Each structure stands twice: as C-alpha cells, then as structure tokens.
Swiss-Prot record:
It comes from the Eukaryota. Kidney, intestine, liver, skeletal muscle and spleen. GO terms for cellular component: plasma membrane. This is Solute carrier family 5 member 4.
Length: 660
C-alpha cells in the first residue's frame, strides 16, 4: 500500500505530456509575474522592518509574531505542493480516506499549543535538539537528532515538494526541469537568506491567502463541471478506464474499479488500504512527531508574542486543516471522472503515454484539472498557487534547517563563534541545502511509483515514531534519562531504517505485481508499523532509564510537565559547557569605528548585519530572557482560546462521524 520506490518499474519521462493549451497567453503570464513581484515585495518589506541582526531576530522573529500570521504560516509550512499532488492523486485512486491524515492534525495542534510549546518556551530553547540537551545533558542526543532532522528535510520534505512542483512546471510551461527548479529555489532562497523567520512568516501569510482563493475557485469549477455533489458521488464510482487489457497482462478489475468504500474514512482493519486502527492510532503517532516535535512547526510557535497568540494560531491552523478534503481530495476524485483514461490508466504502456511512468498517473490528477478546466488568467493564478505552496514549504524548511545546523552543529565545531559568524553560517548553509536539493532531483524522479502521499506518510512512519516517543517521555516522565533516550532513538531508528531500505530495494509492489519484500519486514501496513515502532521505542527508553541513575530534580525545573511551574533556579546539565562558552564571549569582532564602503554597507543591509542594538546590561539581558521564557496569559484570552479549542475538537468529532 505504502508506495515508495521501485526503480525497476519506472520509465523516465521523455518529455512533458501533451496538454491542450500550456500557459503561453498574456493573461496567465501576467498573473504569475505579478505574483512573484508581490511575494518579493513582501519579503523585502519584512527584511527591512524586522531585526535580523541577532540570532533570536533571524531564527525566531524576535518572539513578536501575532496569532493570525503564525497560524497562516503553520498551515502554509505544512501544505506544500506535495499535498496538492499527493492528496488529490490518492483521492483519485482510492477515495476520501486520505483526508483523515489532515483531520488527525486537529487534535495534535491542540496538544502542541497546550502541552508542548509551554515547556519549550520555559526551557528557553530555539531548536528541538537543544531542548534534548537541556533535558538530558550531553551532546550526542543533540547532534544525533540534528543530523537525523536534516536528513529527513532532504530525503522527505524537499524531495517530495520539488517532485510535485516539477509535475506542474512540466505540464504548465514545458520548461527544462532543472532550469525551472533552479529558478524557483533561487527566488525562494533569496528572501529566506535575507529576511529570516519574520520574512518567511509574512510571505507564508500572503501565500496562504493565494492558496485558499485559488483552491476554492478550482473546487467551484470542478463541482460545476461534474454536476454537483450528488452527481459527483455517483459518477466517481463509474469512473473506469476503457483500456484495461494489454502488454500481455491479466489485470484484475480491482486495479481499475473504484473501491466500494471510496466515500468512507474508516476502512477494514485488515484489508483496507488505510485500516481504521492504523488511522486512529498509528497516524496519531506520526502526527505527534510532525506537529509537536518537528523544528519547522515548533519554530513558528516559539516566535509567538505570548501563549494566547500561540494557542490561537494552533486553533486557526486546525480550522484551515479541515479544508484539504474539499480543496484537494475531492477535486482529485473529480479529475478521475473528467479524465478517466489518463488519471485512472492501468495498462503500463498507456500510463507511459500519458505521464511517463508505468505504475499509474494518479499524481497528475490535480495538475490536469488546473490545465484543462481553468480559463486563461485563472490558470495562471492556479500555477501561482502551486508555486506558493511549493515555495512556502521550502522557505520554512530552509530557515528551520539552517537554524538546526547553526545552533546545534556549527556551535560544536566553532565554540567561540560570534553572533555575526553564526548568522553568516546559517545563510551559507541554506545555499548548500539548495545545491543538495538540485542534486536530489534525479532520485525524486524515481519516486513516481504509485501515490506520492503514501510515499510521504510511509517514510514518516519509519523515521518519526522513535522521536515522538522520546519527546513524549522527556516532557511527561521525569524519570527518563539520557542513556534511555539515546538508545531508544538508536534502536527505533535502526528498525525503521531496515523497513525503509527494504522497500527501496524490493519496492512496495502495485496492483499489477506484488512486492518481493520479505513478509517479516514488509508484511505489516506502515501505520501499524509506526505503532509497533513507537511502543518498542518507549519500552527501550523506560527499561534502560529504570536500570540507570535518574536525573536530580534540580536539573529538571521547568523542563518537564510535573515541574513546569517550579520557581527554583535550574542548574542546567550543560551549565559547565555554557560557562566555558561565555568565558570566550564578549569580544565583538566588529570595530564600530571602521569606515565602510558602499559595497560593504549594501552587503550588511542584505544580510541584516548592519542593525546592531545597544549593548545590553546584565539586568536588561535578564529582562529579555524573562520575556523569551514567559508563558503567562491574560485570563480573558486564556478563556477564549480554551473555549475555541473545545469547539475545534467538537468539529473534528463531527467531520469524522459524518464521513465515517
């Protein structure tokens, strides 16, 4: 079911599939150009108005972001072009159940805002590996998690976003793949490098608005074309391709006939493509890793003005996460109705003719809808939507990955690095990420086997659960120590890696040909595997922790839930190392009297290095630290966000029940 890679079944795309009318008219091109100009203008505005000259300013937007741009940024960071391609594609292939992945986030967003973020803020951290270092001490956990997170960024996030964006670019413009991707990444990087997190959050807000407007318009066109909701449900069940024989293959009807449970979210626990116990429990584990411990998501919450703003942002994002079912999954299913021969193709030679890959063209469901259904001008708007979702996800990944590298890895290599050096290192690392991303593209092209969204979720299921287990125990079980956490992560990672490599090597099979992967490794659905992996990791962490010395409470004040309200002074486990670093600090390598030329001034303006605030006294530093670790809320706003959280949970229960 989890569709990953099977190189043996992939045929390289000879060129973009033929579309009746590519984006070559003035209206479409004008819309795209205006879009890029506005995005760059917003990025430059954020660059000039915010303080990017400090690490906190560049990476956390100075903890001054209000709830609505933060909520929009959470949504935009999550919804990449991979969602438009992947959700619509899986919807076209198997119905609405894939939307449960989106709705599952409603609960986890509340867990993030009410339980995880308060601890992260009280801990005074910028990155998730940094939290583990404060909580457990030592360096190996921090370094290991930083490297693993960067690997996940490249192998999973950047790769799937670039692949899905490339589908649109090839269909719409007929451009050379590498030229188009290079241009996109270059523009994306410019405002990430120059603007920092504030720039990313404000451009995300703009792009969320563009995404929602464009998606609603396309949804309207799609439902009008198919004749309304009742007609849609009837026609989808009859969307069967006419060519079902060929290539000397005997193709089972189940490979090309819509599933009987296409309009149900809860599916059979054994035979279902998304079994209901896996959807409720396994999916929650993967979602807990993504929403509560992932750097890209948590970093947005750490930038919030106060806890009420953070909680309101989580609620706003939760409501927005209700929309993908109607904006992406159902339009993907309508695409199967309108373009059955292409989207639902089953004979390998026919699929190669339509989209260049033997195992199906469901990934092309949404792009086809855009290119064939939308009139001029609106087609350009929809391509802008795709570019918006691609670029917003990439900027979020670039900014968060550079934070991880700078704060968790670079500071280990260069212990006495000045703040200016850290800022430059973070920006240079973004450039390195872009190079790696472009080199990764050929590997991404192989990932066309089957359905992109199942590829994304299956890889997440193999890498995420051990991280979720460690963070959950770190916050809610103070008895857990460094040895338990480290070996729980390592053993969980090895188990997940074995399954992932096996699927890369053997493939996951398709309806036409079963995978040769050994049953003992690949026989369990990836959502069940995530659940097994989670509990194995928890058992290892607890067992080793109970067999070794506990961490004294004096090191844990405000780092775990039981001690979250402690007022005693915490002695950090890494305090000795911090003192050593501070002993080498305090010398600013910049000479304030130095005369600078025009080029140097322009460079400093571009990188946000010119705006140095006054040197803070010890008292001012303490006051700033208190602000950055403050989780207090005004009673009125606390009550308002709590009531809204209950309403959001009620809505989540209703939609699950209605589509069950």
């Amino acid at each position: 079911m989890a569709s990953t890679l099977s190189p043996s079944t992939v045929t390289k795309t000879p060129g973009p599939p033929e579309i009746s009318e590519r984006i070559q008219n003035a209206a479409d091109i004008s819309v795209i150009v205006i879009y890029f100009v506005v995005v760059m203008a917003v990025g430059l505005w954020a660059m000039l108005r915010t303080n990017r000259g400090t690490v906190g300013g560049f990476f956390l937007a100075g903890r001054d972001v209000t709830w609505w741009p933060m909520g929009a940024s959470l949504f935009a960071s999550n919804i990449g072009s991979g969602h438009f391609v992947g959700l619509a594609g899986t919807g076209a292939a198997s119905g609405i159940a894939i939307a449960a992945f989106e709705w599952n986030a409603l609960l986890l967003l509340l867990v993030l805002g009410w339980f995880f973020v308060p601890i992260y803020i009280k801990a005074g951290v910028m990155t998730m590996p940094e939290y583990l270092r404060k909580r457990f001490g030592g360096k190996r956990l921090q370094i290991y998690l930083s490297i693993l997170s960067l690997f996940i960024c490249v192998a999973l996030r950047i790769s799937s976003d670039i692949f899905s964006g490339a589908i649109f670019i090839k269909l719409a413009l007929g451009l050379d793949l590498y030229l188009a991707i290079f241009s996109l990444l270059a523009i994306t990087a410019i405002y990430t490098i120059t603007g920092g997190l504030a720039s990313v959050i404000y451009t995300d807000t703009l792009q969320t608005i563009i995404m929602l407007i464009g998606s609603f318009i396309l949804m309207g066109f799609a439902f009008v074309e198919v004749g309304g909701y009742e007609s849609f449900t009837e026609k989808y069940m009859n969307a069967i391709p006419t060519i079902v024989e060929g290539d000397n293959l005997t193709i089972s009807p189940k490979c090309y006939t819509p599933q009987g449970d296409s309009f149900h979210i809860f599916r059979d626990a054994v035979t279902g493509d998304i079994p209901w116990p896996g959807m409720i429990f396994g999916m929650t584990v993967v979602a807990a890793w993504y929403w509560c411990t992932d750097q890209v998501i948590v970093q947005r919450c750490l930038s919030g003005k106060d806890m009420s703003h953070v909680k309101a942002a989580c609620i706003m994002c939760g409501y927005l996460k209700l929309l993908p079912m109607f904006l992406m999954v159902m339009p993907g299913m309508i695409s199967r109705i309108l373009y059955t021969e292409k989207v639902a193709c089953v004979v390998p030679s026919e699929c190669v003719k339509h989209c260049g890959t033997e195992v199906g063209c469901s990934n092309y469901a949404y792009p086809l809808l855009v290119m064939e259904l939308m009139p001029s001008g609106l087609r350009g708007l929809m391509l802008s939507v795709m570019l918006a979702s691609l670029m917003s996800s990439l900027t979020s990944i670039f900014n968060s990955a550079s934070t991880l590298f700078t704060m968790d890895l670079y500071t280990k290599i260069r212990k006495q690095a000045s703040e200016k050096e850290l800022l430059i290192a973070g920006r240079l690392f973004i450039i390195l990420l872009i190079v790696i991303s472009i080199v990764w593209v050929p590997l991404v092209q192989v990932a066309q086997n089957g359905q992109l969204f199942h590829y994304i979720e299956s890889i997440s299921s193999y890498l995420g659960p051990p991280i979720a287990a460690v963070f959950l125990l770190a916050i809610f079980c103070k008895r857990v120590n460094e040895q338990g956490a480290f070996w729980g992560l390592i053993i969980g990672f090895v188990m997940g890696l074995i399954r992932m490599i096996a699927e890369f090597v053997y493939g996951t099979g398709s309806c036409l040909a079963a995978s040769n992967c050994p049953q003992i490794i690949c026989g369990v659905h990836y959502l069940y595997f995530a659940l097994i992996l989670f509990f194995v990791s928890i058992l290892v962490v607890l067992a080793i922790s109970l067999l070794t010395k506990p961490i004294p409470d004096v090191h844990l004040y405000r780092l775990c839930w039981a001690l979250r309200n402690s007022t005693e002074e915490r002695i950090d486990l890494d305090a000795e190392e911090k003192r050593h670093e501070e002993a080498h600090d305090g010398v600013d390598e910049d000479n304030p009297e130095e005369t600078r030329g025009c080029l140097r001034k322009a460079y400093d303006l571009f990188c946000g290095l010119q705006r140095k605030g006054p040197k803070l006294s010890k008292e001012e530093e303490e006051a700033q630290k208190r602000k950055l670790t403050d989780t207090s809320e005004k009673p009125l706003w606390k009550t308002i966000v709590n009531i809204n959280a209950i309403l959001l949970l009620a809505v989540a229960v209703f939609v699950h029940g209605y589509f069950a």
